[in-house]
Amino acid sequence: MAEPPVPILMYHAVATDPNDATRVLSVSPEAFARQMEIVAESGCTPVRTADLAARWRDGRPLPARPVLITFDDGYEGVHRHALPVLAKHGYPATVFVSTGWIRGAYDTGGGLDTMLDWDQVRELAAADVEIGGHTHTHPQLDQLDDSALRHELIHSREIVTDEVGTAPVSLAYPFGYSSRRVREAARESGYGQALAVNNALARRRQGPYALTRLTVRRATTAEEFERLVQGRAIARDFARDRALTKGYALVRRARQVRRKVSRSRV
């Protein structure tokens, strides 16, 4: 019998009044609370990213109706608004932090809104939240040369290890972009699994370094969210996203070709 696919939910900011840069991919605290109620009502079992990957890697069975709750970048509202709701339900989650965006000694000033500080990251880790890597400056990894790529992966992993006390084993690719070269670099940098986007259900056959996620945004209705966690009508709900993604992929490939030609002439 084939293993059922798993919905991996991708959140960003949880905020009452997000700024323009984060609004579309944010959710309100009230919406997040309702969404977690839907997870409970649907009989789903939240698991952390590392736990899902380990079960698939070892061939162990998954819990009933597994779902992953993940947050990218490291916005302060994850601690302020999401953590109390997660704690209320006893749900584990994964937060993927861009270390150069977290407030503190390594802050590059690139954060798009109010970000977590390292004390808050440690409090999340102590509350059954897996802290994953999301690079240092949030670049498009497949557009970097080998040296810059490895620096982004290794430097950010070292910072999380120093600040949290545990090396991150899960990675989320910024913007969801990767390539065979990026996935190999992630493995060599010490990550055991990595998440993309693609707005599709995750399946074991995707491999540990290309697990797909589902975007939860401010426009996601309760009915749409229920379909996400139940794995229904995914292609229909994300049809527009996929069309835009395909178009942008052509643009990005053209840019890569131009860069390769330019480097070959140097």
Residue locations for each model-derived region?
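Metal-dependent polysaccharide deacetylase catalytic core of the NodB/CE4 family, i.e.
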Residues: 4-15, 21, 65-67, 75-79, ...
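C-terminal domain-boundary segment and adjacent tail
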Residues: 26-61, 161-163, 187-208, 246-266
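His/Asp/Glu-enriched short active-site or ligand-binding loop at hydrolase and phosphoryl-transfer sites
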Residues: 97-101, 158-170, 177-226, 238
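Membrane-proximal basic amphipathic "stem/tether" segments
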Residues: 212-266
